[in-house]
């Protein structure tokens, strides 16, 4: 995926009200960006860090600029726009970059499923193969070389794991894919120090047939692609 038009660079002043961030451009102009991330953004929003933002052609938007990437003072790149995790996953599946998810003829998005009537991110279908249900999670929380999910207690994420276990019990493929959007992360682990219940459910889900995939995105201000499998520790 290529950014078009190219991203623009600025320096972060502050993030506030969850959805907004003030930045200053190289020529000294102050802008307010839309922040498409409602999470804690731990380590992703330090004042003084470099941010890369896009600009919408929609003149009716109150905040036409969107915060896409953070570049930390150590040089790490982080994709803070949570919408990209699904977009990159879809692109990677369609281009058959993810070997475990290749060979399907049909891809559907946002399909209702399960007893709790969740919406699955993707469902893959093919003749003579069980349907494959895929839930995508964005990973940006980094501690040393490890990436962790979630960065806050997630009841919604817990529900998704329960639904995936039900899907696996019915004979379908059930997959949770952790999309690592932080260049410094080289391994993945559930954040039991933040949400012990989610970590416990993830282990239970694997034991009950849910497949766990971890793929890292190659990030730059020019574009991104999801392609590198990472090891995990549950």
Swiss-Prot record:
Coiled coil: none annotated. Signal peptide: none annotated. InterPro entries: SfsA (IPR005224), SfsA_C (IPR040452), SfsA_N (IPR041465). It comes from the Bacteria. GO terms for molecular function: DNA binding. PANTHER family: SUGAR FERMENTATION STIMULATION PROTEIN A. HAMAP family: SfsA. Belongs to the SfsA family. This is Sugar fermentation stimulation protein homolog. It comes from Citrobacter koseri (strain ATCC BAA-895 / CDC 4225-83 / SGSC4696).
